[in-house]
Amino acid sequence: MLNQTNRNTLRTKSRKQNKINLITLGCSKNIYDSEVLMGQLKANKKNVVHEEEGNIVVVNTCGFIHNAREESVNTILEQIQKKELGDIDQLFVTGCLSERYKPDLEKEMPQVDAYFGTTDLPQLLKALGADYKHELLGDRITTTPKNYAYFKVSE
């Protein structure tokens, strides 16, 4: 017989199941990349949610200037703490920081389930249980107001 505390815990976990929280840090290129990822996830019928609602977290990092690297590392550490507390089940890191410092990050933060670079979208999708849909190349879910959007010129 489950006591009330266990029942509440199970109910909370089941509500969070397979919901992806995408945290985007850094520049407009990362916003664009996150919008493309959301478009791919939607096409795969994956549920992208806001912060506290997800049990799977993807952190899209920036790694070019010191403050951005610091913000990215601190955000990853916060998510690792949530994972260790059982608040999230999986943690993935993508973006510039992961691209540039992957070996160091894997060594220093092994609690992250996987690290992906800026061109690893198909591999990230596979880790999230989704397929890369070539026909959606460039399609995305915009997160900006309708009167403007980011356009990615280069990597």
PLM regions and their residue ranges:
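Proteins enriched for Cys/Gly/acidic motifs involved in redox and nucleic-acid/cofactor modification
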Residues: 1-155
